[in-house]
Amino acid sequence: LPMDSVMLRGTYTGAKRQLVVPVAYNSSVGAAAVEVANDREDPFVVGHDELTHDMKVTDKGNYGVSYDITIPTQGREPFALYFNPMGGAYAGSVEVEYNGKSQIFDVPDWSLPHMGDGTMYDTQYLATYNPGKPLVIHMMPAGASNLPIRFLLIPVSLVPNV
C-alpha cells in the first residue's frame, strides 16, 4: 500500500508522554506559557512504516500521543489558565486536575466548530486556580487539528473580567 502525502502512517514509540515543568510557575512574578508539540522542548515522535520497507516517519504534531503535563505552582495570587492554539484551527478536549479534583474542558466550548483558524492569538479561558499545588493537564492532540498549542498561566490581576 503506497504512503499518502501526509506520511503519518507508522509504528511509533513514546505514545505516553510525561512532561514536568522543571521550575514552578510563580503567580507573583507574572505570566508564563507551556508549549506542547512544538518539536523544540517537546520533540515529535519518530517511528517507521513497515509497509514501505521500514521507511522512517515523523508524527509532526504528536497526534495520538497521550500527555500528562505537570506544572508546579507557587506565589500569592490566583491565576487563570488559558488554552492557546498557535498552529491554526484546533478543536479537542483537555482534562485539568488540581487539588484532587478533575475537570474536562472542550476547546472551543462548542459554540464554534474550531478556534485558532488564521490567527495565533485566539485563547480560551479554562479556569482560575490558587497557587501552591501542582496543576496536571491530560490531553491528546486532536487529529485534524493544528499544533503547537500553549497553556497560558496569567495572574488574575493582569486579566480583565476573570
Model regions and ranges:
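Long compositionally biased, domain-poor regions of proteins
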Residues: 23-162
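Activation corresponds to long, low-complexity, non-globular regions
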Residues: 1-32, 36
